[in-house]
């Protein structure tokens, strides 16, 4: 299980919500099947719908990756 806080700590190069969304997609494609939203991202561009956006990105990336196998 990937925890959002661990992803953010492990990747200090992530400086925006958009960067974080790309990282979440990479994590899903690497084989993670769960993503825990344990911390709200504190980036200036974090939308109010941040949970839905990250969940959607994670699920779509995982689903598309499985279809391509």
Describe the predicted segments one by one.
Residues 1-69:
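Metal-dependent phosphodiesterase/phospholipase catalytic core, i.e.
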